[in-house]
Every structure is written in C-alpha cells, then in structure tokens.
Amino acid sequence: MAKYVSLTEANEELKVLMDENQTSRPVAVHTSTVNPLGKQLLPKTFGQSSVNIDQQVVIGMPQRPAASNIPVVGSPNPPSTHFASQNQHSYSSPPWAGQHNRKGEKNGMGLCRLSMKVWETVQRKGTTSCQEVVGELVAKFRAASNHASPNESAYDVKNIKRRTYDALNVLMAMNIISREKKKIKWIGLTTNSAQNCQNLRVERQKRLERIKQKQSELQQLILQQIAFKNLVLRNQYVEEQVSQRPLPNSVIHVPFIIISSSKKTVINCSISDDKSEYLFKFNSSFEIHDDTEVLMWMGMTFGLESGSCSAEDLKMARNLVPKALEPYVTEMAQGTFGGVFTTAGSRSNGTWLSASDLTNIAIGMLATSSGGSQYSGSRVETPAVEEEEEEDNNDDDLSENDEDD
C-alpha cells in the first residue's frame, strides 16, 4: 500500500509515492492546473473562517488519463477502498472448521455420549437385555470405524462394553431402569411430585401405626413381667408365713384362661377320648380372659395399666424390670406411654378349644409368633405384622461376565 500521498501548493506538481511492494519502474506523473474557483456553493459558516477560497485544492487519486485537458477531480472509490481492493484476497472456511474432535471420544463413543445412547436405547425398547444393548452400540461403532486397525478396534469394542455396563449400573442405582435376572425394563424419571408426596404420607402413616403397635406390645410384655415376678414374690412370702407348700389341688398353674358368661347361659361341653380337645357350646355370649388380665385384677401390676401407681409401688415395679426398661415403667405410671388397652373380651357362640389352643391364648405376648395373634380382655387386638424376610439378592452390578451366564 502507498505510504504517503503529498500534494504541493496549487498550480505545482503532484508528487505520488508509489507502493513499496511494487517493482520500481518509471512513474508517469500528470500535472493538472486548478484554476481559481469562481462561485461555489459552500456550507454556511458562523463567524470568521480561516479557509482561503482562492487557495482551495481538490485532492484526487492518480487515474488513467483520458484527455490532456480534463482535470483530475476525484476517484470513484475512497482511498481506503481503492487500496484495499488492489490487495484483497477472498478465502473460504474449510469444511472441517468448527469441528473439534476430543481425543478420548472416537466416533461419538465417549462416556457422555455413550451414556445418552444407552439411555435412548433402553427407553426406545422398553424391555431389553444387557447383551442386546451392548450389541447394538458395538454394531454402530463398527459401522462408523471401518478404517480402524483390528487391534485398535478390539480395544475400543471392549471399552464400549465396559462403559455400557457402567451406564446401566448408574441407571439402576437411580431407579430409572430395573433389572429382573437378564431383563432390563425402563421405568423413567418420576415427574409426579404430588403423587410421590401422597405416597410418602401414606407410608409415614403406616409406619406410625406400626410404632403404636410395637409400643402396645412392649407395654403388655412389661406388665406381664412385672405381674409374674410380683406373683413369685408373693407366693414365696406366703410359703414363708405358713411354713409349708400349698396343696396340689389348690394350685393353678400358668398359663391359664378363664371363660365367663351369664348365670343363665347354658353351656354344653364335649371332651375327646384323649382329653386333648374340648368343645364348648354357649347359647349366649361369653368372654375369655387370660392369666395376665387376671393378675391385673389381683393388683400384681401395681396399677400401671391404668396409670394410677403410687411412688412406692413405682419404685417396686422399677426393681422388677431390667434397667433399660425403667424409663418405660415411669411413663406407664404417669400415663404418658403410647399404648392403648381394650377391655372387650372375645365373644362367640361355640368353638373347639384344644389344650394347645388354651395354652397359646394364655401365654399371649410371652411368645410372639410371626403370624400374629388376637388377645382378649385387657390385651390389645394386634393384627398380624408380616416381617419382611431378607431375600438373597442376586441382582449384583452388571459386568462383562454376565454375557457368559
């Protein structure tokens, strides 16, 4: 480009310094005479102006002279445009511009993209298997890498399998997919927050009910322990006072039950030959009371079941239970324990009662069975609570060894 363009005074020579990059050769310099201008349209100025109208010069670019008498009055292009158009070259962007391949991702099989492909594959199929997902992704990779060497291709295929299993394990941990043996099922993301909240409330209520049931069972067991230990102490005291053991026919062994009914009730009892089964038939309702309820009537529980326990009786009751249960005994005496008692007895018009049935009813909460049981009288009617058995979970994390199963 030209460095300088200088113009001397009017009516003198026009000197042009040519481009440094151009080769040196003779330069034609055209001189032109600029006559003093006559009337010209100039912008209106305010105040005095320092511009000399008679000495005005029109600066023009050197152009090809058309005639000797035609003055050079200007250029169709401004200087900057004129010089830029002489040296400007146009370049087009390469087809690979803007594409940056990451070093660790070949053919779009990086960890992030591969995880998305695993997501899309399982979501599209709904129910599939690990081998099916891996096979589809490996097939896509092989179709996209035809020019790869065998060793590199085998390494990439093994890497894809490993990353596919990792992605499936993460989706299972997030509960987006589920696995049953070799089958994989799509679950999806949970979007219904209101339903989840309602489910949590229902689950919370169920757990609170179970806590209440456990509290009631604990209260019954504490009362039984206090009643039996207090009964043992009382019998020992009576034997020391009379200095002899009671007669065998005057002793009632525990466990036992008491069946009560109205005096006008007609009771028919049938006994089997081996005296192992008894059939009772009542023409009116009746009640069955177990040994713990009878001991409560006798005052062996110090009134803990009703919350009316004196300070002295409370001290004795605390001495009859392990130290870890003493706070619960105090709550029972104050009436702040969470247990609830019922007083309605079991009623029926007729039932078979075997010796084993009588024993089970009498023992009650001392031996809690897994199937649950019902307790009459002051016992709480406790529904069966199924214990969740811990099953052997064979659904380990997915690995490449699953293909050999």
Curated annotation (Swiss-Prot):
Listed A to Z, the keywords are: Cytoplasm, DNA-binding, Nucleus, Transcription, Transcription regulation
Where does the source fall among the domains of life?
Answer: Eukaryota
Regions that span the bilayer? none
Single GO MF descriptor: transcription regulator inhibitor activity
Using the chain's own numbering, where are the disulfide bonds?
A: none
Q: Where is the composition biased (Polar residues)?
A: 80-93, 369-379
Q: Name one GO cellular component term.
A: cytoplasm
How the protein is affected by changing residue 112 to R? No effect on down-regulation of E2F transcriptional activity
Compartment annotation: Nucleus; Cytoplasm
InterPro entries (alphabetical): E2F-DP_heterodim, E2F_WHTH_DNA-bd_dom, TF_DP_C_sf, Transc_factor_DP_C, Transcrpt_fac_DP, WH-like_DNA-bd_sf, WH_DNA-bd_sf
- Induction entry: In response to DNA damage.
What are the residue positions of the site described as Critical for repression of E2F activity?
121, 130-131, 140
* Region called DCB1, residue ranges: 209-241
SUPFAM superfamilies per UniProt:
E2F-DP heterodimerization region, Winged helix' DNA-binding domain
Segments of this protein annotated with the region DCB2: 254-310
Sum up the protein's function in the record's words.
Answer: Competitive inhibitor of E2F-mediated transactivation activity. Impairs E2F-mediated cell-cycle progression from G(1) to S phase.
Subunit text: Heterodimer: with E2F family members. TFDP3/E2F heterodimers do not bind DNA and repress E2F-dependent transcriptional activity.
Q: Protein name, please?
A: Transcription factor Dp family member 3
Please report the organism this UniProt entry assigns to the protein: Homo sapiens
